[in-house]
């Protein structure tokens, strides 16, 4: 099995992941922070730049002159204004921020696209994905290397079908993104819960009991005492995870654990940007209002045009 296939299988299937005896396995999907910078506008707008552009793109703007920053910001505003009414709403800003934060996901899909789109038709069929990913293992789906490729392929096919909204077994780029990164799509939430639930539910009764819950996180090492975090997780299961106190977690309880309702950082940042930039206080932003506050949105550190780092692949 080549390295690419090995990494692909590992990224799509968690059933075979192993933990060190005292290493906690985290199944929970949290909304990522918009930036690792401190959000303090009195000191700098670095947090806002990372949130609005994504951390990597924000570094690019740091190399531009103010004039270039304003010009490129104006181009971005045209993209944010989804309904082309000349205004940017809080909702449109929130959508843009979420898009900017997920740019690494889209880049990941782009990097893999040509590898799977064998006939170069701009789509990826299930057959194309299966042949590239499993290839020679189709004839021997149960080799002696510890991987059950038949089981992995069945799981991948189920996920592919769920991502494939129109049911034609051919994925558009957006559907393929949902297949590779289901945690980012609301309509894929069930599979995000179902897959780890199947991994943890060792007795296949459709529930996760306390021992299965702990066993997924912690492998006991001989006579060693359980670390403190394991005791805490036992208490968490009894007090919070098992809401109906029947000694096990059903699908909804598992969903609440794996996909918690986190604070919406993108919504908060969109609200903040509108508040700081909305000069006439009408609850929406014009391009002029945004560009006037370019230092808040994108910033600029370069003062010499010759220092500018010019990129042509803007988003």
From Swiss-Prot:
Query: Which positions does UniProt annotate for Ca(2+) 4 binding?
Result: 201, 203, 205, 212
Q: Which residues bind Ca(2+) 5?
A: 242, 244, 246, 248, 253
User: Mind telling me which SUPFAM superfamilies this protein's record contains?
Assistant: EF-hand
Modified residues annotated as Phosphoserine in this record? 44, 69, 261, 277
Answer yes or no on keyword Transport: no
Chain residues that bind Ca(2+) 2:
117, 119, 121, 128
Q: Does the keyword Metal-binding apply?
A: yes
**InterPro entries, per the entry:** EF-hand-dom_pair, EF_Hand_1_Ca_BS, EF_hand_dom
Its predominant location is: endoplasmic reticulum
Indicate the family of this protein.
Answer: Belongs to the CREC family.
Check the record and name the PANTHER family matching this protein.
Answer: CALUMENIN, RETICULOCALBIN
What is the name attached to this protein's record? Calumenin
């Amino acid at each position: 099995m080549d390295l690419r296939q090995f990494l692909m299988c590992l990224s799509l299937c968690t059933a075979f992941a192993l933990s060190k005896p005292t290493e906690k396995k985290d199944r929970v999907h949290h909304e990522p922070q918009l930036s690792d910078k401190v959000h303090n506008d009195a000191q700098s707008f670095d947090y806002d730049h990372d949130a609005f552009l994504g951390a990597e793109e924000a570094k690019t703007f740091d190399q531009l002159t103010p004039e270039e920053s304003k010009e490129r910001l104006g181009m971005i505003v045209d993209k944010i204004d989804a309904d082309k009414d000349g205004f940017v709403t809080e909702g449109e800003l929130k959508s843009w921020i979420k898009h900017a934060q997920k740019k690494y996901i889209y880049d990941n899909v782009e990097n893999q696209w040509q590898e799977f789109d064998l006939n170069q038709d701009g789509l990826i069929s299930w057959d194309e994905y299966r042949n590239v990913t499993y290839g020679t293992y189709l004839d021997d789906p149960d080799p002696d290397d510890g991987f059950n490729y038949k089981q992995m392929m069945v799981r991948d096919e189920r996920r592919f079908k769920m991502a494939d909204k129109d049911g034609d077994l051919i994925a558009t780029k957006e559907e393929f993104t949902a297949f590779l990164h289901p945690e980012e799509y609301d309509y894929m939430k069930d599979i995000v819960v179902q897959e780890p639930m199947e991994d943890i539910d060792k007795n296949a009764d459709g529930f996760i009991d306390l021992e299965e819950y702990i066993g997924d996180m912690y492998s006991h090492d001989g006579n060693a005492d359980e670390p403190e975090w394991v005791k805490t997780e036992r208490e968490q299961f009894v007090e919070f995870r098992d809401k109906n106190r029947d000694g096990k977690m059903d699908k909804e309880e598992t969903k609440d654990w794996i996909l918690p309702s986190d604070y919406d950082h993108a919504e908060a940042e969109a609200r903040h940007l509108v508040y700081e930039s909305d000069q006439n206080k009408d609850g929406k932003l014009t391009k002029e209002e945004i560009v006037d506050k370019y230092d808040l949105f994108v910033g600029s550190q370069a003062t010499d045009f010759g220092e500018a780092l010019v990129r042509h692949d803007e988003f």
